[in-house]
Amino acid sequence: MGINFDVSRPKARSSINMTTKFHTIGLIGKPHHQGTNQTLKRLHHWLTMQGFEVLVEERVAAELGPNIEAVDLLEIGARCDLAIVVGGDGNMLGAARVLARFDLGVIGVNRGNLGFLTDLPPDAFEEALAKVLDGEFDTEHRFLLEAEVYRHGMLKASNTAVNEAVLHPGKIAHMIEFEVYIDDQFMYSQRADGMIVSTPTGSTAYALSAGGAILTPNLQALILVPMFPHTLSCRPIVVDACSTIKMVVSPDNGENLEVSCDGHVHLAVLPGDEIIVRRSSERLRLIHPKGHNYFHVLRTKLGWGSKLF
C-alpha cells in the first residue's frame, strides 16, 4: 500500500535553524523498490515540512507522486549541500562515483543488507537525521580510485571506483596471466583469476572475501589482493595510496577480459593491454551521526565477538 502525503511547498529558508549546515538536500534511492520508495516519501515530506529545499533524483521521482522536483545526479551535486542515499551500499557506491566530484556531504539510509556506508535506520531516521541537520555530525573523507585501460599506448577507457578496481576474465571464470608493477618497478607475474586493487573503503567488501586485510578508512593505502593465484606463496600486499599500480596483460590471454569498478562499470580489456590504477583526485565526503564508531560497525556488520569483560 502506498503512502499518500499531502506535500506542501517548502517554507522560507529563514525558518531553518541558523546552526543548520545544510539548505538544499538531494534524495537518491534504489528505483522500483517498495521499501525505498516508502522511506523516500517520508523523507521528502519530513524535510519539506522543516523548510528545506528538496530535489529528488529523476529515476525515483516519478514513483513518489506529484509536486516533486526531479533532477539528475549531476544537478544534485551542483545544487545541493547534502545528499541522502536510500538503499544499500551498491546504491551508495553508484551515487558516490558521481557526487565525489562536487563539494557536498553524503549520508545513507540503509535499505540494503550490510550497509557499511549507510548509517541511518529506514524506519526511525528522524531523530538521528535531525541532529545531523542541526550541525551535530562527523565528517569523513574517502578517496576514490581512477582506473584506465591503455592499448598500444592509447587510452581506451577509464572510470572511478569507491571500493575497488578488479581485473578479471569477464563472464567465464578462467585463469589469466599478467604482470604487476608498483611505480614502474616490477613486483611479480601472476597466473590467477584476477587482481583486486582496493581502497580502505573497499577492504571490507570484495577484497575481504578474497582474503585481504581490513584497512581503517583513515589509512592512505591501497591493498592488492590476487584472486585464486596458482601458487602457494602469493599473499595480499598493502602499498602507499600515492602508488601507481600497473597491470600488463599477457598477449597470450584470451579475449573478453574486463576491469570492473565497484562491480558496476565494466571496462573492456584485450590481450596486451595495460591497466593503470591510481588514487583519484576526487574524494567522497561522508557524513555520519555524531559519535560514529568504525569498530562498532565492524562488530555489528561482520558479526565479530562481543566484549568479554
UniProtKB/Swiss-Prot annotation:
One of its GO terms (cellular component) is cytoplasm. Its EC number is 2.7.1.23. Keywords: ATP-binding, Cytoplasm, Kinase, NAD, NADP, Nucleotide-binding, Transferase. One of its GO terms (biological process) is NADP biosynthetic process. The active site is at D89 (proton acceptor). It comes from Shewanella baltica (strain OS155 / ATCC BAA-1091). It catalyses: NAD(+) + ATP = ADP + NADP(+) + H(+). NAD(+) binds at D89, G90, N163, E164, H174, R191, D193, T204, A205, Y206, A207, L208, S209. It comes from the Bacteria. Its cofactor is a divalent metal cation. Its main location: cytoplasm. InterPro entries: ATP-NAD_kinase_N (IPR017438), ATP-NAD_kinase_PpnK-typ_C (IPR017437), NAD/diacylglycerol_kinase_sf (IPR016064), NADK (IPR002504). It is found in: Cytoplasm. This is NAD kinase. It holds the Pfam family NAD_kinase_C. Belongs to the NAD kinase family. One of its GO terms (molecular function) is metal ion binding. Involved in the regulation of the intracellular balance of NAD and NADP, and is a key enzyme in the biosynthesis of NADP. Catalyzes specifically the phosphorylation on 2'-hydroxyl of the adenosine moiety of NAD to yield NADP.
